[in-house]
Amino acid sequence: MKRHVSLSDILTGNKRKVRRQDALQITIDDENDTESGTFDARTAKHDDSSVIFLNHSVVKPIEAVSTNHKSAKEFLMTKRTKEKCDDDDDDLIVISDKSPKSETNCSKIALSQEHEDDISIISTSRIKSSLLNERASKIKNFLKHETTDTFKRLNSISKLNEIEPPLPLHQSIFPVGDKELSDRSVDIPLPFRTIPPLNHNFLPSDYESLKDKNSASCIPVRYQAPVLLGTNIKRNTTLTWPQLFKPVTLKQVLIEPKLKLRIKNWIETSFHTLEKPTLRNRLLNRINPNKQQGSGDELANFIVPDLEEDENLRPDFYRNGEANSSLSEFVPLMILHGNSIGKKTLIQTIMREIAGDDNSYQIYEVNSNMNRSKKDLLDILLDFTTTHYVKDSSKRKSDYGLVLFNDVDVLFKEHDRGYWAMISKLCEFSRRPLVLTCKDLSLVPSELIALASEQNSLFHTKKISTSTVYAFLTKYLKSLEIEVCDDWLRDVVKQNNADIRKCLMHLQFWCVDTEADLISSKNRLPVLTSTLGSSVKDISQLTDLLSINDVIGQATLNRSMVRQEIDSTTMTPEKVNTFQDQNLDDEMKLKFDYVIDYKLHLNDPNRQPLLPFELNIYQHIQEQLEARYSYVREANHRLDNEYLVNRFKKMTESTLNFLASRIPKYDHLQSARRTRNSKKISDILNQFKGIYNDETLNENAEIDLLSATTQQIKAEINPFVFEIAKSDANVKNENKQIFELHSENVSERRYKDLVYQLSQEGVLKNVWFNADPSIVVRKWEHLHSGFSKNK
């Protein structure tokens, strides 16, 4: 058995493994023992390293070759010094640089009898130095073969021979001894400029608001406590007032009367239409056009839903599979959008009036506070919309039922997954009406909006005016035998943004307690004697103050001192990036769920809007300016008059209709000269009779007007359109007079030829609007007459 040991192991008696593979090793052959007292040293090649094999046995002394008897220690001490080597590994037995044959015949080392355990060791620095020289030569040869193109200078600073040192960060030169550095002042000349003198001429009346705090500050007005005229049972109920005064009839719902009747008629018509099978081709062409028109893929419709296999649920085919051409086209979908309050109450009231009894109808309501995913609701809603609900089998009544989807514009990414796909599937198979309510119509799929618009089932509910809400609240309080201050009641309506439910809760909080003392407080504007003069200086001073106050208002608008909590359901970039992680499990997705929106919300804690109870210095200064310059307050008071607001709305509607009737370019009377257009000539004749064609209106006019503010419409658009309407009215009157002058001796049958001849000769002037301009003129005069009455 052979073992590999090092020379240090032999000298020290330790047996350990060799650390390096390229080190010289000694092999001891235990099986083939040599003669006692000798070392049989032989070499062998293992890979690239030389190994010495020593046949070790009991070492016996041999005859000395030299007469000088030296021990191993003395031999090493008299050996000349070799070059130092960087490597400090274990000593190795020197192998001669001669031929391999000489390496196998190793000389025997004589040992003296006095030192039997000593072995002559020769330093291996020569071998190590030769190995290092060979390695260095290989590196040099490798570098010679490498081209200089492989090494590129990464920076221009490597080409410089010298680099200037950077400026020291600290002072490196100090004065010698006790001398201190003397400071020297240097004058730097600046360009000469003159500063105009600031001469402000202030009047004592300008500081009246600071001298007299009682007249300038806001005086709290204490309203009277609610007067309870009697003991009313309704006041002691446990119900909230919105539930107590819930509308019972359709007339009590605070929505536009004409719109309520249109919605009721559509729901009634849908119930009668759905009693028979109907076609849904409009829907199928929009959500799945390949299914109706054919697809290039033969296996596009290979997987067929179970509902399509049931012939009873397919409304557009007979049971034998043949198409029914006599069926009507109808999809039971209605979209109710807008900022009005009470959409759900409106549907419930209409269903109660249609059914005639609370037990004869059923509304399946889907709210935003529940999981509205496709897997949670599709099967339940399909069962409800494709089967009849029978409450009492003995009395089989024709029950009425519909599905009401509330707040469809508020959708969560994970909780409401597959929501719109579920609604599309219900529209395809439902035998009951589907009603969708929302505020923002832009978050509803365009396919459903276009489908509802084609069927005249897209309804917009407008916000109710404050006067209507005030009248209803007065009626409710009167039924409860409660009297309140009218000014305070108007403030309640304005504070709650004309929301009837919030107003009722506000009133219940203050009026239900018989011991209520303080209702509210109001800021009374200071009454000052100074008014705005007619001089340019006064007007300039007012405009400067208003401009400065606007700057203050913009600077303090988003500077709230109250730190508000950030809504965890808001769609932020952090939430979107979190959902892009593929390793996110379903539980974490539900935890970090957010509302789907068409824009990302950036939460800036340093830009929070002012709360209603925080100090608004901009509003305070504005009130002071309005109190000082009375004309501003009078103008605002005139504009706040609801009677004038209604007139302004009518004026704006007439302006919009007039602009929408704009004749396209190259489509006026000049085109009639080249070709005889009977329809255009007929329109001209009708205009002479006072009949105007408003069928072809430009829809872009309303979109362009949406970007304008109310102030721009009042000050710029309406006056400008009024001047255009006056000019257009004069042109049409002149054309009418010219036509009447030339048609005295012409029969009525030849009126078209006469108009064509006059247009070719250029006698008739061009008109640019099809609408009646006199309507705009009348609305403008009606509006200004209202201003003159309120002065």
Curated annotation (Swiss-Prot):
Q: Self-association or partners: how does it assemble?
A: Component of the ELG1-RFC complex which consists of ELG1, RFC2, RFC3, RFC4 and RFC5.
- Organism encoding this protein: Saccharomyces cerevisiae (strain ATCC 204508 / S288c)
Extract one GO BP annotation from the record.
double-strand break repair via homologous recombination
Q: Which family does it belong to?
A: Belongs to the ELG1 family.
The UniProt entry, under InterPro entries, shows:
P-loop_NTPase (IPR027417)
Q: Where in the cell is it found?
A: Nucleus; Chromosome, Telomere
Question: Which named protein is this?
Answer: Telomere length regulation protein ELG1
The protein's matches in Gene3D superfamilies, at most eight in alphabetical order, are given as: P-loop containing nucleotide triphosphate hydrolases (3.40.50.300)
The organism's taxonomy opens as: Eukaryota, Fungi, Dikarya, Ascomycota, Saccharomycotina
**Alphabetically ordered keywords of this record:** Cell cycle, Chromosome, Nucleus, Phosphoprotein, Telomere
Q: Does the keyword Nucleus apply?
A: yes
GO CC, sorted alphabetically, is: chromosome, telomeric region; cytoplasm; Elg1 RFC-like complex; mitochondrion; nucleus
Role this protein plays: Involved in the negative control of telomere length and in telomeric silencing through a replication-mediated pathway. May have a role in Okazaki fragment maturation. Required for S-phase progression. Component of the RFC-like ELG1-RFC complex which appears to have a role in DNA replication, replication fork re-start, recombination and repair.
Q: Does the keyword Lipid metabolism apply?
A: no
Tell me where in this chain the PTM Phosphoserine is found: 6
| Gene designation per UniProt | ELG1
Alphabetically, the GO molecular function entries are: chromatin binding; DNA binding
Q: What PANTHER family is this protein classified in?
A: CHROMOSOME TRANSMISSION FIDELITY FACTOR 18 (PTHR23389), TELOMERE LENGTH REGULATION PROTEIN ELG1 (PTHR23389:SF11)
What residue intervals traverse the membrane?
none
